[in-house]
Amino acid sequence: MIQQESRLKIADNTGAREILCIRVLGGSTRRFAGIGDVIVATVKEAAPGGNVKSGEIVKAVIVRTKKETRRADGSYISFDENAAVIIKNDNEPRGTRIFGPVARELREKKFMKIVSLAPEVI
């Protein structure tokens, strides 16, 4: 469950290490974002020589959350950290590698490229 001012780790190789959520996309009254939702964020910490710089405004899709997510079969899934992947305007990832597991819900939300790059889909 991500909201404004939430900080997330980055699970790709764009050079960003941490982002801060500015806005949850999907309507003016939408407060929270879960796995597979798109947010607008600013880069708070970045590695030197990366594709993105500190202070840059980016779009990102959430791939892991600490808050559990309920699935259709009644099971719940949660992760150890809140993490996101930086995406372009056409919902393709900006990086070429994804680190750590991602949730199966991304496949239903049509983020196929992220699912195919991920080392593990849970």
UniProtKB/Swiss-Prot annotation:
This is Large ribosomal subunit protein uL14. The gene is rplN. It comes from Corynebacterium efficiens (strain DSM 44549 / YS-314 / AJ 12310 / JCM 11189 / NBRC 100395). SUPFAM superfamilies: Ribosomal protein L14. Binds to 23S rRNA. Forms part of two intersubunit bridges in the 70S ribosome. One of its GO terms (cellular component) is cytosolic large ribosomal subunit. Part of the 50S ribosomal subunit. Forms a cluster with proteins L3 and L19. In the 70S ribosome, L14 and L19 interact and together make contacts with the 16S rRNA in bridges B5 and B8. HAMAP family: Ribosomal_uL14. One of its GO terms (biological process) is translation. The keyword Ribonucleoprotein applies. GO terms for molecular function: large ribosomal subunit rRNA binding; structural constituent of ribosome. Keywords: Ribonucleoprotein, Ribosomal protein, RNA-binding, rRNA-binding. Belongs to the universal ribosomal protein uL14 family.
